C-alpha cells in the first residue's frame, strides 16, 4: 500500500531535491499508481525550534509538515513500486557532498553513518520481496555516479541492483 514513512521524515528546503528525486524515480514507471508529497502529522517538537522550515510549517501549513508517500510491502518500506514491472525502487539523491576528491569519505562518520546502513536497508528489502518469487525485482537508483560508486564500495551494495539515473536538469 501507499502511505507515509513509518519513521518521521520531513521535507525541508535543504533536502527538497532528495525528495523530488525520490518521487521522480518512484513515478517513472509506477502508473497507474502515483506517489507524491503529503501532509505529515503536526510538526515534530524535536525539530529545531527556530528553523525557517519549522516557522514556515506553522505559518503556512497550520503547524503541519510535508513528507512523501512510500510503498509498504511485507513490513518494509520502499520509495516506490512499478506495478507492471513488479519492481520496488529506492532512490538516493545528493550524497556527493560527503565524498572527498578521491571518492573516499570526506568525514569520519560518512562510511558508518551513511553508507553502511544502506547495506542493511538493501538486505531488508531483498528479504521482504523474496516471498513474491522471481518476478519481484529491487532496483536502487542514484542521482550521482560518484555516490553510486561509493555505495557499492563502502556499503557493499549489490552492483547489479544499483543504477545511475540522473535527475533532469541536474549535473551528476
Describe the predicted segments one by one.
Residues 94-114:
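A solvent-exposed, charged loop/short amphipathic helix patch at secondary-structure junctions
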Residues 71, 112-120:
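Conserved phosphate-coordination/catalytic loops
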Residues 3-19, 29-30, 46-49, 107-111, ...:
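Short, structured coil/loop segments at alpha-helix boundaries
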Residues 79-82, 86-100, 125:
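Conserved catalytic cores of phosphodiester-cleaving nucleases, focusing on short active-site segments
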Residues 119, 123-172:
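Active-site or metal-binding loop neighborhoods of secreted/extracellular toxin and effector enzymes
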Residues 1-77, 83-84:
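Acidic-basic catalytic patches of nuclease active cores, encompassing PD-(D/E)XK
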Amino acid at each position: 500500500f501507499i502511505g507515509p514513512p513509518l519513521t518521521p521524515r520531513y521535507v525541508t528546503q535543504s533536502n527538497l531535491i532528495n525528495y523530488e528525486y525520490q518521487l521522480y524515480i518512484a513515478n517513472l514507471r509506477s502508473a497507474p499508481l502515483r506517489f507524491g508529497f503529503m501532509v505529515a502529522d503536526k510538526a515534530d517538537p524535536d525539530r529545531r525550534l527556530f528553523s525557517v522550515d519549522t516557522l514556515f510549517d506553522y505559518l503556512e501549513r497550520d503547524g503541519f509538515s510535508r513528507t512523501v508517500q512510500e510503498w509498504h510491502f511485507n513490513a518494509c518500506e520502499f520509495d516506490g513500486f512499478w506495478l507492471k514491472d513488479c519492481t520496488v525502487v529506492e532512490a538516493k539523491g545528493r550524497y556527493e557532498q560527503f565524498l572527498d576528491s578521491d571518492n573516499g569519505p570526506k568525514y569520519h562518520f560518512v562510511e558508518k553513518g551513511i553508507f553502511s546502513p544502506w547495506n542493511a536497508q538493501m538486505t531488508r528489502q531483498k528479504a521482504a520481496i523474496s516471498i513474491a518469487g522471481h518476478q519481484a525485482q529491487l532496483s536502487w537508483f542514484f542521482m550521482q555516479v560518484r555516490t553510486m560508486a561509493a555505495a557499492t564500495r563502502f556499503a557493499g551494495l549489490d552492483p547489479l541492483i544499483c543504477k545511475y539515473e540522473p535527475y533532469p536538469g541536474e549535473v551528476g
